[in-house]
């Protein structure tokens, strides 16, 4: 049974993606900091027939993240799809003149370095199988910097650069790497089917080869 690991799993997009992939026969590894909330999500997914387990980890702590992914692989099977979508702290959304080096480093640890640790944990199994997908979820500051959102304007482009390089190197190995850019909060986008439309787009990125970056909506239509 294929397995998707959703890093940054929450009751919104993470749960929607879990349901979407669960309908396709995936087991779901839910990873975030709050074990209690993960347990609630596991119960809700079980009620609709989706197999899932929750693993608490802070993406800024490499040992925690690597341990969570290792336990998921041991209990559910090799990770075939990795979704990296932790929601940045509002501390990272400071104006540029308030940005400190320490906060910038933390934002980079949260986004770019966390992704690198996660990829290095799951990639060997994907390479051995010559199959898999890695999907990044980012806001609009991954494409265009905004002075009012300095942390993500620094960290998201670094995460994006790493992802794009992976896309170019791994496409010949049967591993798809893509980024979905969501400019603004999902409720404000007024999608016909709401968050389920976003989950459908992520499923499409998993199943179809293509360019690295996909914009959910044109950047100028979003907030961030």
Regions found by a protein language model. Give the residues of each.
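Conserved glycine-rich cofactor-binding loop
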Residues: 10-11
